[in-house]
């Protein structure tokens, strides 16, 4: 059995899980998510626990088993607690601000870059150099954060760009200089 797939998913109070053919609906205090499930996987909802069972030990079924369990667990955590990613903006004159729901970034271009949040995603700017991307869908939060980071990736030679909070700053050494 898949080590991850066989773990039961605890369902917190206030969260309901419904199983339908080909999908699992998860509802909670923060919202509702629908997870597509392979028809070969069997999802069982017991009191306070969700289990995923696979039909055989084929390689394909083993990989689907762990994937399905993780996607459902992410949905359960998302509707109960939510997900967020924090980005740091470093550089002279680099900053962010909210314009309505949209995020406006001034990151060294001749124009400000405006990022509209997709449905289910919110931006927070606690400081001009910090941006928090929040939502209930882990994949969407990560993708939006990656898209923002891609606007001005961290520079390898200068400590400027958009970083994930906690991301190590890897700087290359500059030119060694001429030897005399």
Curated annotation (Swiss-Prot):
Keywords: Ribonucleoprotein, Ribosomal protein, RNA-binding, rRNA-binding. GO terms for molecular function: rRNA binding; structural constituent of ribosome. It comes from the Bacteria. It holds the Pfam family Ribosomal_L6. The keyword ATP-binding does not apply. The keyword Metal-binding does not apply. GO terms for biological process: cytoplasmic translation. GO terms for cellular component: cytosolic large ribosomal subunit. Belongs to the universal ribosomal protein uL6 family. This protein binds to the 23S rRNA, and is important in its secondary structure. It is located near the subunit interface in the base of the L7/L12 stalk, and near the tRNA binding site of the peptidyltransferase center. Part of the 50S ribosomal subunit. This is Large ribosomal subunit protein uL6. It comes from Thermus thermophilus (strain ATCC BAA-163 / DSM 7039 / HB27).
